[in-house]
C-alpha cells in the first residue's frame, strides 16, 4: 500500500521543531499550521518566558501531546504528560478530549476529559486534574472531578479555583435542546469536589447550538471566555464573551466569531477552538485548530492541526489583526523572531498516489 505524501510550497516549516531559525529580512512571518498533522484541540500556556502548547490524541497514546517554544514560532516536542492513562477499550474518537493547561501559584495545572463511549444518546465522560511544579513532571495522581460534562476549563480566581464544563442534558422534554450551557463550579482541587453549578454562558446568536472547549482568562479588568461553536466540521468557529466578574454572566462579543473559515476561501478549514496568550514582544496571539483538504476532495488526511493568529485589542475585544474572522495561512511573527520566508499556497505532491479510497482513512484523524 502506497500512501500519498503531502507537502506545501513554504520555504520554512514551523514543524522543524529543533531546527535553527532561518535567516530572513524583517518583517518576519510564519506559516500555519504551526503544528501540522494530528494536533487537535490546542491550548496555549505561558509561564514566564516559556510557552507550552498541548493537544489531544483521543484514543491514542500519549493522550496529551506537549510542545515548548520561546517565540511561538519554533516548537519542540516534550513528549506527553499523562503517564497513568489507560485507553484500553476506548473507541475511535473517544479518549482524551480538549486538554486545558494553565500556570498559577508556581504550578502547572492540566484538566482533561476521557470519553469512554461516543455512540448513543448518552456519553460517559470523566474529567480529571493533574498538576506539577515542573512541566516535565513528575505529575500528580489524577484527581477525578465531581461534575459531569466535557472539555473542562480551570479558572484561577483570587478567591479560589473554578471549574467550567459544557454540559449535555438529554432529557426528552418538549422544546428542550440537548446542550445545557457552560456551567461553572467552585472546585476543591485536592478532592475534586465541586459546589453548586452556575450557568455562565449559553451560545451566541438566536439559534441554540453546542458551545464547547471553553477557556477563561483575565485581562484589563475583564474576564474573557473563548469557546468553540458550530460543531467540528466546516462551520466550526471560536467565539468570545466577557464579564466583569469571574462568575459571569458572560456577554457575547459584537461581531462574533473571532475565528472561522466558514464561507471563506481559507485553506485552513474547520478553524476554531483555542485561547489567547501575550507574545514575547507584547503582541497577542490566538491558537486554534484547523484542517487542510486534498484539492478537489473532502478528505483531510493530516487530521486537525494547530495554528496561530495575530490578535489586536480593539475597544476591549480581541480581533484578528487583519480584520474579519478568516484564518490566515501566513501570520506576522513576534518582533525580533526570525521565522523565514513563506508563501500561502499549499500543494500536494502528485508524484505519489494512494491505493485505497480516502474513506478508508480514520475519520478521527481526518478531523
Language-model features, listed with the residues they occupy:
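Carbohydrate-active catalytic/glycan-binding domains of CAZyme proteins
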Residues: 1-367
Amino acid at each position: 500500500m502506497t500512501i500519498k505524501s503531502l507537502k506545501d510550497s513554504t520555504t520554512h516549516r514551523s514543524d522543524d521543531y529543533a531546527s535553527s531559525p532561518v535567516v530572513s529580512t524583517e518583517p518576519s512571518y510564519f506559516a500555519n499550521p504551526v503544528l501540522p498533522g494530528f494536533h487537535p484541540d490546542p491550548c496555549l500556556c505561558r509561564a514566564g518566558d516559556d510557552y507550552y502548547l498541548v493537544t489531544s490524541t483521543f484514543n491514542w497514546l500519549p493522550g496529551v501531546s506537549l510542545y515548548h517554544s520561546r517565540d511561538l514560532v519554533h516548537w519542540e516536542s516534550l513528549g506527553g504528560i499523562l503517564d497513568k492513562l489507560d485507553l484500553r477499550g476506548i473507541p475511535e474518537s473517544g479518549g482524551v478530549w480538549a486538554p486545558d493547561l494553565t500556570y498559577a501559584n508556581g504550578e502547572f495545572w492540566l484538566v482533561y476529559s476521557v470519553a469512554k463511549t461516543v455512540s448513543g444518546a448518552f456519553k460517559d465522560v470523566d474529567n480529571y486534574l493533574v498538576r506539577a511544579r515542573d512541566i516535565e513532571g513528575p505529575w500528580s495522581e489524577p484527581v477525578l472531578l465531581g461534575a459531569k460534562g466535557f472539555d473542562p476549563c480551570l479558572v484561577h480566581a483570587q478567591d479560589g479555583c473554578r471549574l467550567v464544563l459544557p454540559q449535555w442534558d438529554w432529557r426528552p422534554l418538549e422544546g428542550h435542546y440537548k446542550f445545557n450551557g457552560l456551567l461553572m463550579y467552585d472546585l476543591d482541587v485536592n478532592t475534586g469536589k465541586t459546589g453548586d453549578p452556575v450557568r455562565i454562558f449559553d451560545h451566541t446568536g438566536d439559534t441554540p447550538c453546542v458551545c464547547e472547549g471553553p477557556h477563561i482568562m483575565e485581562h484589563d479588568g475583564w474576564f474573557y471566555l473563548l469557546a468553540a461553536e458550530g460543531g467540528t466540521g466546516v462551520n466550526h468557529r471560536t467565539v468570545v464573551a466577557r464579564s466583569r466578574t469571574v462568575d459571569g454572566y458572560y456577554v457575547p462579543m459584537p461581531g462574533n466569531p473571532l475565528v472561522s473559515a466558514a464561507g471563506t476561501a481559507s485553506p485552513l478549514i474547520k478553524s476554531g477552538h483555542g485561547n489567547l496568550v501575550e507574545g514575547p514582544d507584547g503582541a497577542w496571539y490566538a491558537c486554534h485548530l484547523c484542517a487542510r483538504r486534498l484539492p478537489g476532495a473532502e478528505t483531510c488526511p493530516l487530521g486537525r492541526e494547530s495554528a496561530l493568529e495575530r490578535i489586536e485589542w480593539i475597544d476591549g475585544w480581541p480581533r484578528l489583526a487583519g480584520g474579519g474572522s478568516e484564518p490566515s495561512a501566513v501570520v506576522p511573527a513576534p518582533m525580533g523572531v526570525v521565522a523565514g520566508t513563506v508563501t500561502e499556497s499549499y500543494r500536494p505532491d502528485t508524484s505519489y498516489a494512494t491505493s485505497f479510497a480516502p474513506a478508508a482513512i480514520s475519520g478521527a484523524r481526518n478531523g
